[in-house]
Amino acid sequence: VHRMMEGLAYLREMNVASVLLRLTVAMLFGGFIGLERERKRRPAGFRTYMLVCLGAALTMLLSQYESYMVTHAWHETAMEIGLRTDVSRFGAQVINGIGFLGAGTIIVTGKQEVKGLTTAAGLWASACMGLAIGAGFYECVLLGFLLILLTNRLLPFVEDAIIESARNMNIYVEFQTLDNLGDIIA
């Protein structure tokens, strides 16, 4: 157990092995989630999810690298010019950016149905997972990955069962004009 904890501590540090592991995990986990979405022929698939997760992990690694450099290698220069960093800004910008990508997957059909929300949410979750991977928060990453897969694979069946047993009904009606609307509602 002690050796395992030492190994995990080593992988949380900033070194070549840690960076390689984090980027590989981001690529694999993002791709695996995207594969499931692509199998269902959704707007974003294998490569999109892989790139979102990988990009988020890279951003977090860059954030950590900058923080380290400003407090170590660049410390004297940073102090001389009064340079301050806020490592949370990198992650925040990933979340902002993913909003635009997610918005591109959402459409309203001719029947006024909204489609693509799960894809947009999945891209957002994949980006968040990438940030956690980049930070080396492996326990969170593994649990998050499993829960994202569970949400995408198992919960649609639960959702369908709930909808089928519900007593509610959705009726879609389109009107050319509103002339007789009062008669129809009455």
What are these regions (language model features)?
Residues G31-R42, L101-Q112, F157:
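C-terminal ends of transmembrane helices
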Residues L51-L62, A121-I133:
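Small-residue-rich segments of transmembrane alpha-helices in multi-pass membrane proteins
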Residues G30, A56-M60, I98-T105, I148-P156:
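Alpha-helical transmembrane segments of multi-pass membrane proteins
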Residues T71, R89-T105:
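Hydrophobic, membrane-facing alpha-helical anchors
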Residues V1-I81, S88:
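Alpha-helical transmembrane segments and their membrane-interface boundaries
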Residues F137-A186:
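Canonical alpha-helical transmembrane segment with a positive-inside/aromatic-interface signature
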Residues E6-T24, L131-I133, Y138-T151:
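Hydrophobic alpha-helical transmembrane segments of small proteolipidic membrane proteins, enriched
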